[in-house]
A protein has these predicted regions:
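Cysteine-centered catalytic environments shared across enzyme families
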Residues: 1-177
Length: 177
């Protein structure tokens, strides 16, 4: 069980905030907290990850980066990661971990809509594609892995594996829905 957290929008280019958000999820991943951020036309994107090492203990620190510039954080398990490795041989694999299969499948996609249908597993992830200017948030079809989200009054999207990670951001005001 890992924890992911991040922000996207006017004040999203903030690795320290992403780190603070992920730190509130340290109980989900005691093997290290990493963060990353980047400026973008929408303001910025910041991603944080609290890691529990199960597969590829030394080599799969997150965020994961692809050669095309995409960045991924994931909480989950990809059951068919070996099949994806076999199918997407042209992808320059950097780790032995199962999460990188998401980056490979996205990079090798033939359509912007069907690539996720080829993933078998349980997950909550955030994938930043800087060329498209898109942040993709996804949960597995059954919703086993949690992924909470909210938007601040300034228009920044906050997300995390648990709602407690959202509290790190000063613009988060909890409200009943």
């Amino acid at each position: 069980m890992c924890g992911i957290a991040g922000l996207f929008g006017p004040d999203g280019n903030d690795a320290e905030m992403a780190h603070s958000m992920a730190s509130l999820l340290a109980h989900r991943g005691p093997d290290g907290i990493q963060s990353w951020s980047e400026e973008c036309p929408h303001g910025g994107v910041g991603l944080g990850h609290s890691r529990l090492s199960i597969v590829d203990i030394q080599g799969s620190n997150q965020p994961l980066h692809s050669d095309s510039g995409c960045v991924l954080i994931i909480n989950g398990e990809i059951y068919n990661h070996q099949k994806i490795r076999d199918d997407v041989r042209e992808y320059p694999w950097r780790t032995q971990g199962d999460g990188e299969a998401i980056l490979a499948a996205y990079t090798a996609r033939k359509s912007s809509e069907d690539w996720l249908n080829h993933i078998d597993g349980i997950w909550g992830f955030a994938l930043w594609d800087p060329k498209a200017g898109h942040l993709i948030l996804s949960r597995d079809p059954i919703g086993v892995k949690p992924l909470m989200r909210t938007i601040t009054s300034e228009g920044t999207l906050l997300f995390g594996s648990e709602s407690k990670s959202l509290r790190a951001h000063p613009g988060h005001i909890p409200q009943l829905d």
